[in-house]
């Protein structure tokens, strides 16, 4: 995941670990040689349009709106075709009310129409305060949540690890976060909910208590699920 920071002092650029306490809890219950937190890539304002999510100080949110409004008005001034013109006018109306384009319901065709536009507020925008920057761990977790990301855990043997996926991802999609070969050969997902894992006192104990479920590729992953994927090699 890539986070675009619009001049928010105190948020470091580059790759950053998101220290999810649930992985810490899992690491205490299941021995492994290594613990790996999920990572995000933080880029500055000059690369923000390439990011999945935009982060801005609350007092500067209007700057993003004005950037997009200027872009939309410029496009309208070039006499676009009717379909584009109607969509641009819809976006203009929202921006003039200081809203974000991400709040507009669009058809797949409309999204395709503007896929090449350089718009900021079509992405999830997370508004933060200066005080929040003092606790980067909590801030990164909120940014992920507000941007529609969750994680799942894999534990045991060589590594205990948390993997980032979009909320609503299927088990098949989640397996691809680990390796494309696992996704291609997907058979079933062994799933233990995080609460069941903690209450049982570990992965082995949860299995013995009958808390492990076999799920198909269509299963919707839940936040902090423990997963092991069976696949054809």
Where are these regions (language model features)?
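A general secondary-structure boundary signal
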Residues: 41-43, 73, 224
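Conserved G1/Walker A P-loop phosphate-binding module
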Residues: 1-58
